[in-house]
Amino acid sequence: MEDPLLLGDDQLITRNLKSTPTWWMNFTAELKNVSSMAAPMATVTVSQYLLPVISVMVAGHCGELQLSGVTLATAFANVSGFGIMYGLVGALETLCGQAYGAKQYTKIGTYTFSAIVSNVPIVVLISILWFYMDKLFVSLGQDPDISKVAGSYAVCLIPALLAQAVQQPLTRFLQTQGLVLPLLYCAITTLLFHIPVCLILVYAFGLGSNGAALAIGLSYWFNVLILALYVRFSSACEKTRGFVSDDFVLSVKQFFQYGIPSAAMTTIEWSLFELLILSSGLLPNPKLETSVLSICLTTSSLHCVIPMGIGAAGSTRISNELGAGNPEVARLAVFAGIFLWFLEATICSTLLFTCKNIFGYAFSNSKEVVDYVTELSSLLCLSFMVDGFSSVLDGVARGSGWQNIGAWANVVAYYLLGAPVGFFLGFWGHMNGKGLWIGVIVGSTAQGIILAIVTACLSWEEQAAKARERIVGRTLE
């Protein structure tokens, strides 16, 4: 059983808190707490990110048509399905995290169960859309053969989406209690399980690209199984795996109250990146532009898992301490997350900039592509900085419970600022893919600025009071 990360009065030096020596001691302690969670969570996110990527890579060896169809289906499925599942459970980072801090342990199990039940009908609705994905793509002007492969792949992804409806709440159930090592072991085991299963279904069973999609579903359900077994039999979850039926209806209401804006935060951001790739096909020399922007997007997405891990750790620490009534510790968790972001982004940006002349060869042997990637490397380094900052502050929003503000911030940042700037520079400014990527940076920068202003203006004492009212208010009546 892992040690709890909540800081009690005996662990936090409260006397003369604003003095430099005392503040630094508390900050160092909190930095250690956030770091101990951020590293495992980043590894968990990397493992989960690589799982569908491996399926795309294996399916791509079935032929160019299969690669195009699978890539198209994956992009659409991420925005219309998996992104929604990932976003909705952001509500649990608020509710379960603050309930754990407030020692309302049975509510953690109730919130998690209500999330799973609430996710299932949403999966059914999304699945109906996926059944007609091929016809949708054809109506949007996509190649009929590619659309047929994409539609078939999407239908085979439905079991994976249903698994995510269970896996994501279980992940947040453990994360918000600081139980990140079980998540780490399960994620790595699942990734190792997925590789042979994918190869067997695609080649040994002759299922082709559809086998790659089915392998994702099998691997996700395998992860659900081992997570569920841990939750059921581990003594670390003994207090929190309970269920209170009287709180179920209220829990569902609260889940959607925070889950819908949280899902909006995710899908608004993810959809802009997919729109970027689709738009690159309308530029002069679309093959080059699409290839280079796909490389930039892949690199940026892979890097983002690190600040996402920091954001998840920060979210947990903030929600735990607000629920426990420790606003000063929650404030320190914000500073700790920002410090880790700056350190990580500086290292990764410096490394990429140093290798910018050879970086493109990791993806292509074409000198034209490599030279273009080199030209965009400076912008990609800047993306590392601003995207990481936004990811950490997204965690602050989820931990504090102001996802609705975060959703509106994303609308303003990405669709009122980022997208117009990108399209103007890319098409009318004749900067092509470079202009589109500048639009992404503008959107991420605007998002970070808005979230930073909101965070700076927060009254943490008020946030702690809201957390207590949110979690235990009904109990105290």
Curated annotation (Swiss-Prot):
Alphabetical keyword list: Membrane, Transmembrane, Transmembrane helix, Transport
GO annotation, biological process: xenobiotic detoxification by transmembrane export across the plasma membrane
A molecular function GO annotation: antiporter activity
Subcellular compartments: Membrane
Entry protein name: Protein DETOXIFICATION 5
Membrane topology: Multi-pass membrane protein
Sequence similarity: Belongs to the multi antimicrobial extrusion (MATE) (TC 2.A.66.1) family.
Transmembrane portions of the chain: 38-58, 72-92, 113-133, 146-166, 187-207, 211-231, 263-283, 292-312, 333-353, 376-396, 411-431, 436-456
GO cellular component: membrane
Pfam families in the record: MatE
InterPro entries documented for this protein: MATE_euk, MATE_fam
